Amino acid sequence: MTAILITGYRSFEIGIFDHKDPRVSIIKQAIRKDLIGYLENGVDWFIFTGNLGFEQWALEVANELKEEYPLQIATIFLFETHGDRWNEKNQKVLSQFRAVDFVKYYFPNYEQPTQFSQYYQFLLEKTEGAYVFYDTENETNLKYFLKKAKDMPHYQLLLLTFDRLNDMSQS
């Protein structure tokens, strides 16, 4: 079994507030290309954390690819309360994350800040690599996960950056 964590920018972090934004289709094209590459190299599990934005779009692409490839999808939420306060539109997205092959909640609810690092350590230990939409020019809290991932020997990171997206949009 080979598992890849998929995570990246949330929609609000990159200023995308509408699913019909033309940037979403470019991002999804890149996701499709990269996920097919993973599948053709033997990856059989895609792991998500249940966030809106990049993960949401990658989940949509992964579900489409299930028709062509034998793959499994998991969502490992940080807390059982993840998304409880989301609006109705976002609740529909949350239900898609819960309708995958495997769902786990790492903690019942928030108690202390160390839960975040414990969660990321668990994700790193349970996956062989990560596909991350992230650019050092636009830092978020993902920088802490990436630092841990880069410190792990043999952990494979594939970054989708703004430069890669620009190259794709021009070709």
From Swiss-Prot:
The record's section on InterPro entries has: YspA
User: Mind telling me which residue stretches traverse the membrane in this protein?
Assistant: none
PANTHER family hit by this protein: UPF0398 PROTEIN SPR0331, UPF0398 PROTEIN YPSA
Report the sequence similarity comment from the record: Belongs to the UPF0398 family.
Q: Which NCBIfam families match?
A: PRK13660.1
Its name, as the record gives it, is UPF0398 protein MGAS2096_Spy1375
